[in-house]
Amino acid sequence: DVYVETRTVIGPKAKKPLVLDIPIMAGGMAFGLGLSEHVKVAIAKGTAKVGTCTNSGEGPLLPEERAAAKYYILQYSAGTWSKETETLRQADAIEIRLGQGAIAGVGGVIPGENVHGRLAELLNVPEGKQVIIPSKHEELPRSKDLKRLADRFRSVTGGVPIGIKLAPSAWLEADLDLAIR
């Protein structure tokens, strides 16, 4: 038998690196937009048992999911939810969502018929109200504002790792250069 080190460190230079037991993470899948509360909590419990993290996805922070997770990545979306300092401080890492897959710079809509119960409560909107997810972050009018936002997150969280989720263009290196400035 050969020993294989599976421990994975996200943000090794962060004040509070995220140290996972295995190099596998649950991807971002949102409560109420894609998954039910029961599924989100089950994924959080499963990731906790194997020593890895779960990800909020584009939806709001679900307190029951956070309580069940050992490690939690908060996806910071262009929506109006999960932006409070108290919410940010619950994250073991923050992923700034700029795009994904083939939908860079595209917003979204949560139909009113899907906005009820717990989802309406956590989004802080009336039941039945359609929710628009903007195509871009209001606080990021220019690429140089990304550093300011990341610095704010580092400050309020005590230094958790900050990453981005993007759908790169045909000029990947240029996209990455803008992201790391």
Regions found by a protein language model. Give the residues of each.
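N-terminal capping/small domains of soluble enzymes
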Residues: 1-134, 145
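Glycine-rich phosphate/ribose-binding loops and adjacent secondary-structure elements
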Residues: 137-181
